[in-house]
């Protein structure tokens, strides 16, 4: 969606959902997945793909593009993992239930004029900031990482559910992580290398093309 009003509505609906979910404490025996360990695993996958490409005598179109850009994405991933580790070690993060896949496809506008989250199959114990980061990332990718879009989403969320300094730092670290690049790398790593999907090549080329806009946003958003 490109409508600011729609994005604001989705963001408010997410905040309302988080307000409800945090009323239900997690059982003491439930383990919450480590965010920094997850980020480190994804960084390791980038390095693994890089090493695979280095061993090849001839690279294809995807591998050529990957090798052009992997260093800066890997650097972002490592920095994100470092911040996530710092936050998790501080013991200040409060886990609760999360939607798990909150994007424009999982929030609907009802006939009564309300925005409601749907499709809760992916709900899991975690940190609510991960839902907000996923929603912001999806919307920013569709809007050239426009700071006005980011501000609109964040302001709408905070009008319903406030974020303290720790939550903001977590959100920033999650947005810093090169999630889309890792997703493309993982898809390629699990595919047949003898046949390169043109769609993957196009997606990576587009990601590189838009990386300047993303980095400009991160420059002002990450403190």
Report the location of each language-model feature.
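A glycine-centered beta->alpha junction motif in the catalytic cores
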Residues: 1, 19, 23, 47-59, ...
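ATP-binding pocket architecture of kinase catalytic cores
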Residues: 1-29
């Amino acid at each position: 969606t490109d409508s600011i009003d729609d994005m604001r509505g989705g963001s408010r609906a997410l905040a309302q959902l988080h307000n409800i979910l945090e009323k239900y404490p997690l059982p003491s025996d439930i383990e919450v997945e480590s965010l920094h360990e997850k980020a480190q695993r994804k960084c390791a996958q980038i390095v693994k793909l890089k090493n695979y490409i280095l061993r090849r005598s001839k690279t294809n179109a995807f591998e050529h593009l990957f090798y052009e850009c992997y260093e800066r994405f890997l650097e972002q991933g490592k920095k994100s993992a470092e911040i996530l580790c710092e936050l998790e070690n501080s013991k200040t993060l409060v886990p609760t239930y999360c939607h798990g896949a909150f994007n424009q496809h999982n929030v609907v506008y009802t006939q009564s004029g309300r925005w409601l989250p749907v499709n809760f199959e992916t709900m899991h114990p975690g940190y609510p900031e991960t839902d907000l980061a996923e929603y912001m990332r999806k919307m920013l990718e569709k809007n050239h990482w426009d700071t006005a879009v980011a501000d609109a989403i964040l302001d709408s969320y905070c009008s319903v559910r406030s974020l303290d300094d720790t939550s903001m730092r977590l959100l920033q670290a999650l947005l810093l992580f090169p999630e889309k690049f890792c997703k493309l790398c993982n898809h390629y790593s699990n595919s047949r290398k003898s046949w390169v999907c043109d769609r993957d090549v196009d997606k990576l080329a587009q990601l590189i093309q838009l990386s300047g806009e993303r980095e400009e946003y991160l420059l002002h958003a990450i403190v």
